């Protein structure tokens, strides 16, 4: 993805108030933060099976999509949006939560496997390729060993961020929103050099 290519940013998540503040919905959170900052609003688009916001105009218009299909069928909405707008894969970026990264870390990649994430699995299935950009947003993993992690995965990703995590989450969302602008202005490689090197930490309140 070169600078100026980005046209569609998709945040992965689950629809409904029940899931609104869960770790699995951090992609939705980032898009809502960006739309709020830019004065945009989401509207229902049944033909895309999602909610859509438009930012900017003309050649600089950026569309934000939150699939309403539930996580495991996200690819259906993404495929519909690409077809409806006539976008190519190099114009797409997917925002996704990642348990393999701690909260405070980001990883921008031009392509890759699903890594066990059902939303990415669905996207790869419906697009027929792994060759699309994705920004993985760390949410941390439950437990210290594989068996504990496996047992607690569902409750972790469908659980809300704790009050202690919220200040760091706020910093992460700000970096993601700023990172989208970096991608537009600099392209994927240069933006990735910055985003992939971040190691955000909560602001200390100690005197």
Curated annotation (Swiss-Prot):
Secretion signal, residue range per the UniProt entry? none
Q: Which keywords does this chain's UniProt record carry?
A: Cytoplasm, Hydrolase, RNA-binding, tRNA-binding
Q: Could you say which residues are annotated as the site Stabilizes the basic form of H active site to accept a proton?
A: 97
Q: Which GO terms describe its cellular component?
A: cytoplasm
Alphabetical list of InterPro entries matching this protein: Pept_tRNA_hydro, Pept_tRNA_hydro_CS, Pept_tRNA_hydro_sf
- Give one GO molecular function term: tRNA binding
For site (Discriminates between blocked and unblocked aminoacyl-tRNA), what residue positions does UniProt give?
14
Q: What class of enzyme is it?
A: hydrolase
Catalytic activity field? an N-acyl-L-alpha-aminoacyl-tRNA + H2O = an N-acyl-L-amino acid + a tRNA + H(+)
Give the positions the UniProt entry annotates as the active site: 24
Where does the source fall among the domains of life? Bacteria
Binding of tRNA, residues: 19, 70, 72, 118
Residues crossing the lipid bilayer are none
The record's section on CDD domains has: PTH (cd00462)
Keyword RNA-binding (UniProt): yes
The record's listing under Gene3D superfamilies reads:
Peptidyl-tRNA hydrolase
Compartments where located? Cytoplasm
Family per similarity comment: Belongs to the PTH family.
Q: How does it assemble?
A: Monomer.
List the protein's name.
Peptidyl-tRNA hydrolase
Q: Which gene encodes it?
A: pth
